[in-house]
């Protein structure tokens, strides 16, 4: 079982390069996966197949995408830029 110290930083928990999954939640718009992929491709070019799941009421979609992260700066930049997409509500 992994126990994480509350003072531990994400960069101290990861060894790069590593597999890293982003879960982006936003309004149920058909362009959501495209906008997420556009940001991902800018910082981690590759061939991705994001998984899209609707919420129970269908108002929101979650887009999960796994990348090979090369640095903590890349991870943080992607969190920031994914969160700035106009139809995104949350990035995990």
UniProtKB/Swiss-Prot annotation:
Coiled-coil stretches: none
Record InterPro entries: UPF0250_YbeD-like (IPR007454), YbeD-like_sf (IPR027471)
Gene Ontology cellular component terms for the protein in this record: cytosol
Cited SUPFAM superfamilies: YbeD/HP0495-like (SSF117991)
Gene3D superfamilies in UniProt: 3.30.70.260
Transmembrane segments: none
Pfam families assigned to the protein according to its UniProt record, in alphabetical order: DUF493
Xref: PANTHER family: UPF0250 PROTEIN YBED
Family: Belongs to the UPF0250 family.
Protein name: UPF0250 protein VV0902
Organism: Vibrio vulnificus (strain YJ016)
Taxonomic path: Bacteria, Pseudomonadati, Pseudomonadota, Gammaproteobacteria, Vibrionales
């Amino acid at each position: 079982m992994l126990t994480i110290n509350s003072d531990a930083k994400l960069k101290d928990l990861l060894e790069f390069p590593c597999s890293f999954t982003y879960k982006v939640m936003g309004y149920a718009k058909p362009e959501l996966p495209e906008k997420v992929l556009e940001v991902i491709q800018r910082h981690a070019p590759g061939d991705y197949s994001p998984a899209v799941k609707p919420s129970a009421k269908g108002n929101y979609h979650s887009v999960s995408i796994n990348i090979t992260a090369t640095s903590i700066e890349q991870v943080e930049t992607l969190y920031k830029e994914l969160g700035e997409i106009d139809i995104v509500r949350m990035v995990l």
